[in-house]
């Protein structure tokens, strides 16, 4: 493994995509303290990270998935039929109402559609969206959600258990394929069912998981277009929704390339070049780097 300089280490600490699902409360708190020790006072991560309540007003996804904020957020309840919110101490179960409604509906339909017992829901967004101190570069406008690839237990977990319970790693140690000891046909059915949702723009998974899906997708492979390989994501998958209708300040992402994404595009992820750390911002985001409306939103009571 190549040596990383101090700046690169700091970037990885801020944007450690692969660490967010499995970190327990103590580990996440340590990364939070490290981030706060280096961030300038006007860093957007610091400003949005201290907000504990949503901004009143109509729901509005403002800006881009990786550079924006969220007005009128609602929280996914900690418990519901066929779902449980994980890592509750992070206070990241907030989202645009369109996303929260989708998660609740998926929790209702997936037991029958995918033989999946229920959703363990990871990070969604902060109460007012915006950049996070740890774990994510996106999740800023309430349209991203992490779903653990661990089946929901048959009992209700305590808050302490939800902050400490480890997530299941589905990828082999060398990163080349799924681990047959943990990967199941239900995982494929789960991801296919979610990808077929019209509101879902794309789903991020580990490249090894994409490779397994390419092998087993069946004759109708259209849903694979939405399954996008990305660093980490061996413990959870990341749902991203399209900008909702009537949200003019929401900036859509460039659509993924046509096709199932199972050829040379996927092969790159298993090259030495792809083993380098994921790209991160050259410097912390400042409040002025976000859409102008975000400064007013974060200043509101």
Language-model-detected regions and their locations in the chain:
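N-terminal signal peptide c-region/cleavage motif recognized by signal peptidases
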Residues: 16-18
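Extended, low-complexity, intrinsically disordered C-terminal regulatory tails
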Residues: 49, 102-134, 204-226
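Bacterial N-terminal signal peptides that target proteins for export
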Residues: 1-7
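Envelope-exposed proteins and targeting segments
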Residues: 115-120, 141-145, 199, 233-237
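Short, surface-exposed glycine/acidic/tryptophan-bearing loops
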Residues: 134-151
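Active-site acidic/histidine clusters and adjacent loop/turn architecture
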Residues: 49, 53-121, 183-190, 197-200
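N-terminal low-complexity, Pro/Thr/Ser-rich intrinsically disordered segments
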Residues: 24-67
